[in-house]
Amino acid sequence: TTPEQARSYVRQIAKDKPDLIKLMITGGVLDAKVKGEPGELKMSPEIVKAACEEAHALGLHVAAHVESPQGVQVALENGVDTIEHGALPSEAIIQLFQDRKACQVATLSPALPFALFDRHVSHVSEMEQYNGKIVFDGIVECAKACLANGIPVGLGTDTGCPYITHYDMWREVNYFHKFCGVSN
């Protein structure tokens, strides 16, 4: 894909009047090829920038599936408005969130079974569990750091992932309290 193709895709999607454009900037736990490296970058910075510029020119916000620090950095440096999931943030990443006035949507529910369930229950491989723990911890630490720095954090469930249904938002709220230490 080229930057111009990315712009073209955004224009095509915009014809259907979506609420936003969502980019899949990284992979995740299930497609990781290396233990300890979930969230492999799937989009170049140039593609992300082109898609974001086009979406913003059309009045659309851009959300991005991101599950690695590199992915968060590429997303924020190139115009993404909201990080879906998240990853272990550095001080530079927190500064990017602030500079861009971006936010995070934490999704603990889909990562939790991979990270914390017994493998006899989750039926995941040892590598998927290991990488799931990295992603889960990254989402939690990203949310904590964002909150500590006045960056808005929303909650989502990532419905459709294993063990996640359309009516599981109550679990997400419970996990947010339990793992991020947030209450009302």
Protein language model regions, located:
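His/Asp/Glu-enriched, well-ordered alpha-helical/loop segment
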Residues: 57, 61, 124-127, 136-184
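Structural recognition of alpha->loop->beta junctions
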Residues: 73-93, 150, 172-184
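Divalent-metal coordination cores built from histidine and acidic residues
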Residues: 1-60, 93-95, 100-113, 117-120, ...
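A cross-domain feature marking catalytic cores of carbohydrate-active enzymes
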Residues: 23-25, 64-68, 85-87, 106-108, ...
